[in-house]
């Protein structure tokens, strides 16, 4: 296996056999369908397991990575050192009044569905974002003029000392694709959003409209991590890339989408290196043509 075999045995005291694996290919866990193995991957089923895992990692100085739905992640071909903590089994959603509370691993589409079923409007923007609520808080995810900062009420997080604390909207410091969670390395375990009462039919119509727009404009038929680049101030990344003649540009199995130039996709059989090489070429070309720096929105992690 790897250098963390002894640590794997320690973690095994907290997990059932099916909830802890070694050398798990990250290509099976992220939307891009690329990436080498995680030394250890755990899927906690309660908060206690999360806290115990974090405490052990910190006590033994073992690196860890928090994984939501894997929709905004690019894992390098060498995989991930240490422990990947995947939150997909922590996905409970509850509603009370105008508030929806979801565990970190709950999918945004399911939170959106819960809001719809309770005639709550304001979360339609997230219906097609393929991430989890924890990841959405982490990066202040958004689409179609909406973002988490518009609806978040509070979040429960685990801080750097493994203490659970409640953060208000203001304390979360949500900015463009950033948050205090990202800056300080906190772990989101639950989030509450506050919405407005609405009519089921109009909420459903908006969800359907946004879904149709997404399907018509984005290359959803290919593995990707969604929008590859952050929006540079005063520009649109996709237009800069298209105007640079890079639509369809490819290296190996990775390519700039023909459908939307802001997406780098896996056409089939891509390696993480292929994707990274395409990203680097796009950044270099746009810089040369327009003197604009493109920064990745997708998180790039792992070993070369």
Curated annotation (Swiss-Prot):
The active site is at residues 177, 227, 297. Coiled coil: none annotated. GO terms for molecular function: FAD binding; UDP-N-acetylmuramate dehydrogenase activity. The keyword Oxidoreductase applies. PROSITE patterns: FAD_PCMH (PS51387). Disulfide bonds: none annotated. Its main location: cytoplasm. It is an enzyme of class 1 (oxidoreductase). It holds the Pfam family MurB_C. The keyword Disulfide bond does not apply. Residues 33-198 form the FAD-binding PCMH-type domain. Pathway: Cell wall biogenesis; peptidoglycan biosynthesis. NCBIfam families: murB, PRK13905.1. This is UDP-N-acetylenolpyruvoylglucosamine reductase. It comes from Clostridium perfringens (strain SM101 / Type A). The gene is murB.
């Amino acid at each position: 296996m790897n250098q963390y075999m002894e640590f794997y045995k320690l973690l095994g005291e907290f997990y059932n056999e099916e909830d802890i694996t070694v050398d798990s290919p990250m290509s099976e866990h992220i939307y891009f369908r690329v990436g080498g193995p995680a030394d250890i991957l755990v899927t906690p089923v309660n908060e206690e397991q999360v806290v115990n895992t974090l405490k052990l990692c910190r006590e033994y100085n073992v690196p860890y990575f928090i994984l939501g739905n894997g929709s905004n992640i690019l894992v390098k071909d060498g995989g991930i050192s240490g422990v990947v903590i995947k939150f997909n089994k922590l996905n409970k959603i509850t509603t009370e009044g105008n508030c929806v509370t979801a565990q970190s691993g709950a999918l945004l589409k399911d939170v959106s569905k819960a809001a719809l079923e309770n005639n709550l409007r304001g979360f339609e923007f997230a219906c097609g974002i393929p991430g989890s609520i924890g990841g959405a808080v982490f990066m202040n995810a958004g689409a179609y003029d909406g973002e988490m900062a518009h609806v978040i009420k509070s979040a429960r997080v685990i801080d750097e000392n493994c203490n659970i604390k409640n953060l208000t909207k203001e304390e979360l410091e949500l900015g463009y694709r950033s948050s205090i969670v990202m800056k300080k390395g906190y772990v989101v375990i639950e989030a509450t959003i506050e919405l407005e009462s609405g009519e089921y039919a109009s909420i459903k119509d908006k969800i359907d409209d946004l879904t149709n727009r997404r399907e018509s404009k984005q290359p959803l038929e290919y593995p990707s991590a969604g929008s590859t680049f952050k929006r540079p101030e005063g520009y649109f990344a996709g237009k800069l890339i298209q105007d640079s003649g890079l639509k369809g540009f490819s290296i190996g199995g990775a390519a700039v989408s023909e459908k939307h130039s802001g997406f780098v996709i896996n056409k089939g059989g891509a390696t993480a290196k292929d994707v990274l090489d395409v990203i680097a070429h796009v950044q270099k070309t746009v810089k040369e043509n327009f003197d604009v720096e493109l920064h990745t929105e997708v998180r790039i992690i792992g070993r070369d």
